[in-house]
A protein has these predicted regions:
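Conserved AdoMet/S-adenosylmethionine-binding subsite of the radical SAM
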Residues: 50-170
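Short glycine-rich, polar/acidic loop-and-turn segments at beta strand-coil junctions
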Residues: 1, 12, 44-46, 71-75, ...
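Short secondary-structure boundary micro-motifs
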Residues: 2, 24-25, 92, 100
């Protein structure tokens, strides 16, 4: 992962070197090829940093398997990930992106200085491609991450607050 979040459930981060090997990707593709699997849910951090991510997505979509990419939005702003947003859109990958809050101070306090700004740029890049517009079929879901040992608030008012604030502040 390109971030170091204290709450990370997979203990990912830029100093970690482990990644799923090419042989394991081949096994996943073989399993998908056998049939019966409708959705491939790829989780991160930033699973796009795996050297075999695009090959896995292409294979899954070629088999008619829905692909979900659970990621952070800042990965779209990494120089070595040029064309990633376009790749995801071209393959109709559903994006489940972590955005812990719609306020920059809260996000940067949880994830590091500048993370909010890069997240908004990534979100705008996805929106420009049709993600979240309700017409393109490109699905974008934002995930709220509570800070501390607490449950999140009810989804409907939280979703509306995100939409209202992000729309008014960033278009």
């Amino acid at each position: 992962c390109n971030q170091s979040c204290l709450h990370c459930h997979v203990a990912a981060g830029p100093n970690r070197t482990e990644e799923m090997a090419d042989e394991d990707i081949d096994l996943v593709i073989a399993l998908l090829s056998a049939g019966g699997i409708e959705t491939l849910d790829i989780t991160g951090g930033a699973p796009e940093l795996n050297a075999h991510f695009r090959r896995l997505v292409e294979a899954a979509r070629g088999l008619g398997v829905k692909v979900m990419d659970r990621c952070n939005l800042t990965i779209l702003e990494q120089p070595d990930q040029a064309g990633l947003a376009e790749f995801l859109a071209a393959h109709q990958v559903e994006i489940v992106a972590s955005l812990p809050c719609y306020l920059s101070d809260n996000v940067d306090a949880q994830r590091g200085k500048g993370v909010f700004k890069d997240s908004i740029r990534g979100l705008q890049r996805l929106n420009a491609l049709g993600y979240g517009d309700g017409r393109s079929g490109l699905v974008l879901n934002l995930v709220y991450n509570p800070q501390g040992a607490q449950l999140p608030p009810a989804q409907e008012p939280l979703e509306q607050a995100y939409k209202d604030r992000l729309r008014s502040d960033y278009g």
